[in-house]
Amino acid sequence: GVHDVWIIDGLAYSSNWADGVHIVDVGATKLNEADRSKNQYNPFLAMAGQGSPGNPVKLGEMKDPNGHNHAAFPFISQSSDKFYIIAGDEYGGEFGMAGGFHFLDFTDPNNPEETAVYQVPEAGSHNHWVHGDTLLASYYQGGLRVVDISGELMGDIYAQGREIAYFNSSDPKGYVANRPNVWGTMPYKGLIYFSDMNNGLW
């Protein structure tokens, strides 16, 4: 079933656990080749133009063999112009220390492939946001992680040392003392905000 949907430019990016990521035209305006000179290029917008909220049209998909696809965020690399969907796992928050963020290269929408993953070994992933070529990752027990995702994205991003910042939001006066439980994050006016289910809004 559907767990989460992100809609931008009339395209719905649906996260469906084991069914993975689906890209659906729900009212997108078709772009043509000439738009490449004016916009970073989303290949699904080149395929769009037939769907509507009452008549959605599926344009692409990629299954999740692990069965834990929780959230999907479209990302056009500022440095390589490749089109990715970053698919986040969820394995159970307080009860699980697993999951990561999978970089699905949809530059060729008919032949998507997973090229990279960012996974903190000791923590479980939840929501995420992309700002420019930077990933903001909510990592339950692992706090907030800020990751450089510029350039070529291949292999184990965590092992490559791309993490550029980390914030541990544990608090001795929290709902569960001295334990972060970061749920979601987003940037706004030069700051990063995130919610922690044990320790409030930061």
Descriptions of predicted regions:
Residues 1-202:
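Feature marking well-ordered beta-strand scaffolds used for ligand recognition
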